[in-house]
Design a protein with these regions (language model features):
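C-terminal helical subdomain
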Residues: 60-63, 68, 76-128
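Glycine-centered, small-residue-biased loops immediately flanking beta-strands
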Residues: 15
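Active-site helix of classical SDR
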Residues: 4, 38
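Active-site-adjacent segment of SDR/Rossmann-fold oxidoreductases
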Residues: 10, 27, 48-57
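Active-site loop immediately N-terminal to the catalytic Tyr-X3-Lys motif
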Residues: 29-33
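Residue(s) in the substrate-gating loop at a strand-loop-helix junction
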Residues: 22
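Hydrophobic structural elements of the Rossmann-like NAD(P)H-binding subdomain
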Residues: 18, 58-61, 71
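Catalytic Tyr-X3-Lys loop
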Residues: 1-2, 42
Length: 128
């Protein structure tokens, strides 16, 4: 947040800010209180900044369930430590996780768009 505030005041010209949000900002996930709360804060911060700076493109994107090292760490935990682990293992085994490259391509597509997009959006809605 401090870095983005500095960016808004110190950098001249056209500006765009994209924050990494999460669906976890909208759902209470047992064992993830800090993660859910921090992602909810990211969503609200982006929403408030967008109101304060309507001339700028400010967004928080939800990348979806992405096959990252974080996902591997989640799957390696026990049900005792994270009751929802079975769901994440199932998502991985079914092949339904999104590749990081897919998210990056979708985000680049959004950045290049000149039309209106919601402040909070899912990259799965903007595939190439």
């Amino acid at each position: 947040m401090l870095l983005s505030a500095k960016f808004l005041t110190e950098i001249a010209g056209e500006k765009q800010l994209y924050f990494t949000g999460s669906g976890a900002a909208e759902f209470a996930i047992e064992g993830w209180s800090a993660y859910c709360a921090s992602k909810a804060a990211v969503h609200m911060y982006a929403s408030v900044l967008a109101k304060e700076h309507p001339d700028l493109r400010i967004h928080a994107f939800r990348p979806g369930k992405v096959n990252t090292p974080m996902q591997a760490e989640i799957r390696a935990t026990t049900a005792e430590n994270f009751p929802g682990v079975a769901h994440f293992v199932e998502e991985f085994e079914s092949g339904s996780l999104v590749l990081p490259e897919t998210v990056a391509t979708s985000l680049l597509h959004v950045i290049d768009r000149k039309d209106e997009i919601p402040v909070i959006f899912s990259t799965s809605n903007y595939t190439v």
